[in-house]
Amino acid sequence: MTVSAAEQYLLELINRARLDPQAEAARYGLSLNAGLTAGTISGTPVQVLTHNTELEQAAQGHSEWILETDTFSHTGAGGSDPGDRIVAAGYELTGSWTWRENLAWTGSTSEIDLVEAVEDHHEGLYRSAGHRENTFASDIREIGVAQVEGRFTHDGSTFNASALTLNFASSGTDNFITGVAYTDSDADDFYLSLIHI
């Protein structure tokens, strides 16, 4: 599967937050532990996450299911939970393992901008205590990001929507090297500014 530019951008936002939790808290004007027990999120940097194809495949399937069924839930097709879906996609849970899932959706009656939607998703998930805890979890190393554009009906109204599933996991003892190769074809220094935002 190919990660879209908007999905890669979201991964960069998540990794920026994990590398400097205090700056992310200042950026959104909300304490790292708002709504959580003091010290749940330590404020010290945690390792960045690397993309995993199986986690992405599970996330993609769930985001599509959300839009196809107009159902926003961690319980998915056939009553599956996130662990069921990542294993079905081929992710092996071996040794010491864990998984987590964040979901978000945003909609508009006009055209939806997927990059703006990603920014909205990231901020909204930060503002939710449980989702923030997942984002800053020190026991995860891999992520699957799937943003799907489509129509979503909520409370009797149908929207042009962005449905997002983030599957976080860690399994076994493998180590990863990760990074982004970027050609700044329009010379706007976008990724340089991203790390200084």
Model-derived segments and spans:
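Short regulatory "switch" loops immediately downstream of catalytic or recognition motifs
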Residues: 16-32, 106-108, 147-153, 183-188
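A short, Gly/Thr-enriched small/hydrophobic beta-strand-prone motif that recurs across taxa
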Residues: 171-189
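A well-ordered secondary-structure block
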Residues: 57, 61-170
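Alpha-helical architecture
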Residues: 13, 125-126, 186
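Conserved small/polar residues in nucleotide/adenosyl-binding loops
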Residues: 195-197
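A short alpha-helix/helix-coil micro-patch that ends at or immediately precedes a cysteine
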Residues: 2-69
